A protein has these predicted regions:
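Membrane-embedded alpha-helical bundles of multi-pass integral membrane proteins
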Residues: 1-222
Length: 222
């Protein structure tokens, strides 16, 4: 679905007149990083901008964290160990918490503050729900794992994952067999949610994740 959506948008772009929009790639990349991660435009509205940046940083950090796990599993090279693993765990959890806070701020703004210029439709709530689910499911899976493998056997290690640790404390009274079944179930639910999220990005409210980056990179530098 994602590839199909991107292909359709690319065909639309190709229908226009050709222009040089890939020249000076380093300048374009620098502008992209400043615009996206600096949040200059978004922070004109402090609450909306802060929520956007928290979600962005949280999402990017979780993407990096998940990618590192995948690289380790596929390569067979175990580099998530020792102090690096502790830092990695803390980094992933803190940014995941930041992402959840950002989703909460955005939802609060739409549900209760309701600025006059802000028009909320179903797609807005769907986007926030998907983002919140992706973050929350990650903590749920981590919490189940910690409850089984670290909470009692390695409590010092578990503390480096504060979000997962909080979930683990709540779940620890459950039998190990129940926790293992819950872990497998949550893993598949999370995988389906993540793939659904990726497909949704090409069509829904979050399409700016893909197309906004392309638009900023290929902006007119004249």
């Amino acid at each position: 679905l994602f590839a199909r959506g991107v292909a359709r948008r690319y065909a639309l772009w190709r229908s226009g007149r050709p222009q040089a929009r890939f020249d000076r790639p380093l300048l374009r990349l620098r502008g992209l990083l400043v615009e996206v991660f600096g949040g200059r435009r978004q922070l004109r509205d402090p609450l909306a901008g802060s929520a956007h940046l928290l979600i962005l940083y949280g999402f990017c950090a979780e993407l990096v964290a998940t990618s590192l796990i995948s690289i380790q599993d596929w390569s067979g090279v175990h580099f998530l160990e020792g102090r690096f693993y502790l830092g990695y765990s803390l980094f992933a959890d803190l940014f995941g918490i930041a992402g959840l806070i950002g989703v909460g701020m955005a939802a609060w703004r739409r549900a209760f503050l309701r600025p006059a210029h802000l028009h909320t439709v179903f797609d807005d709530w769907l986007a926030l729900a998907l983002l919140g689910l992706v973050f929350a499911q990650g903590f749920a899976i981590e919490g189940v794992r910690i409850a089984v493998t670290e909470l009692e056997a390695q409590p010092g290690l578990a503390l480096w994952s504060p979000g997962g640790y909080a979930v683990a404390v709540l779940l620890r009274p459950l039998p190990d067999a129940t926790l293992l079944l819950l872990h497998r179930t949550l893993w598949w639910v999370h995988a389906l949610t993540a793939f659904g999220f990726i497909g949704y990005v090409a069509y829904g409210k979050l399409e700016h994740i893909a197309y906004g980056l392309a638009n900023v990179f290929t902006r007119n530098l004249a």
